[in-house]
């Protein structure tokens, strides 16, 4: 992996982390198209640079993270299902992260669900439930929705937003809670990956991680503002159509003999 690769992946991550189109799926596709080797470092890189994007949430929403123990407890409860399920199925997830075909099907199925949800929950206006209205039981449900996103291509933000909508949150509140839940989730995922590779990581690879995280952070700052504005005005339907088209294009390329698998 070169610095140019790290910058491109950082841009891809920053743009896609908070959109319901799967940042991991897009990075797997981008890595495949650039011919980046499918190594343990590459897989770790694709997870760790997500923390760079997540840091933008702390900057943009810092007031929400001031001492507010009820808020922290709900975030922790929502995080637990993902942590537990992730630990149990981590090897399966590692294997799936190398499959562009899995990403393609996840994009298509997720796109169909997004389009359905945009219509089914269109009645939820700004009067919907707020984050402070969530119960601990609601938090567990949101955590279970997030756990589904361990399948590459599903989209963590898309899954948690969907969970928020089913609980009666409006689109803006559901999207913002998805941002907040990303902080402990990706912090834990980053720590786990660092512990796995810290003994073998080389100085040059550390620099690649820093570059990727920095780029993802800056780009994500812009993407969050864009996403909230789009969702508030137009909903999720456009993202759903995008997912379906991208997934179909990938499948067509695969089934016509184009090798998109990581090398």
Swiss-Prot record:
It is found in: Cell inner membrane. It is a multi-pass membrane protein. Its EC number is 3.6.1.27. Disulfide bonds: none annotated. It catalyses: di-trans,octa-cis-undecaprenyl diphosphate + H2O = di-trans,octa-cis-undecaprenyl phosphate + phosphate + H(+). One of its GO terms (molecular function) is undecaprenyl-diphosphatase activity. Keywords: Antibiotic resistance, Cell inner membrane, Cell membrane, Cell shape, Cell wall biogenesis/degradation, Hydrolase, Membrane, Peptidoglycan synthesis, Transmembrane, Transmembrane helix. Signal peptide: none annotated. It comes from the Bacteria. It is an enzyme of class 3 (hydrolase). The keyword Hydrolase applies. GO terms for biological process: cell wall organization; peptidoglycan biosynthetic process; regulation of cell shape; response to antibiotic. GO terms for cellular component: plasma membrane. Belongs to the UppP family. Catalyzes the dephosphorylation of undecaprenyl diphosphate (UPP). Confers resistance to bacitracin. This is Undecaprenyl-diphosphatase.
